[in-house]
Amino acid sequence: MLSPVLIAIDGSSASHGLLELAQQYCQPGLHRLHVLLAVDSAFSLSDGPRAISLYEQQEFPAATDEQRHAVAAVQQALRRLRALGFESEGKLAQDDPVTAIVSEAQRLDCALIIIGHRHLNRLGRLLDPSISNKVIDQVKCPVLVDSRQT
């Protein structure tokens, strides 16, 4: 049985670093990699890839763009991981990142979570606490945080 590893991407260029860490610390044949991207429900049309209707494109242009970007980011990550020989699955979640990551990690009974870190100043951390810190406080599995600046 393959050990599940959750890679929480955000669709930014920092996601490439998370995939590099997965390649470095995980092995095909030993780990199944699960890519998760959480999208704010105000800017999401669905929890997965599906055709976006003309109505949605006209009435919700920001959500349409966000949905397309999220789907493309997950698909690109999966292509890269599969090309490296990993069994992998992807998921979009309409939720705040902490809730989405914690619930998916619990559902999968993850052996590891790989997550990024935003480098905020003190005021930024006070106003918008770290997602990675919140995840670490709520899960029972190890969390590998990519603290490299992109």
Where are the predicted features?
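A short acidic, glycine-rich active-site loop
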Residues: 55-72
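Short, hinge-like loop/turn segments at secondary-structure boundaries
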Residues: 50-54, 107-109, 131-132
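Short, flexible loop segments at boundaries between secondary-structure elements
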Residues: 141-150
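Conserved beta-strand positions in the Rossmann-like core of class I SAM-dependent methyltransferases
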Residues: 34, 89, 144
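Glycine-rich, Arg-bearing micro-motifs that act as flexible, cationic patches
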Residues: 112-138
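Structural beta-alpha unit
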Residues: 76-113, 150
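Small/aliphatic-rich secondary-structure junction motif
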Residues: 1-57, 86
